[in-house]
């Protein structure tokens, strides 16, 4: 990510998103487990959350879980009776996501 893009993303995250212990812990765990830092940003995660929520989704299928960061954002948008299914080909990634 370019410096300007990162600065804008950091600003949006600081002003609009606030702190979230579960998401922060997920990112730390992903790094500690050696996963590539290719998660969506917090702002992108919030956008996924809003899009899923606005669509009224009751079921979400995510292909490619990595460490589960975006999975958490998407799952939070579901109603109580919603269903989140995520698929991950790499065993290590799936184990880390399950921990998160």
Language model features with spans:
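N-terminal auxiliary segments of SAM/dcSAM-dependent transferases
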Residues: 1-23
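Short, contiguous strand/loop micro-motifs
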Residues: 13-14, 34-36
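N-terminal beta-alpha supersecondary unit
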Residues: 30-31
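S-adenosylmethionine/decaboxylated-SAM
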Residues: 3, 38-100
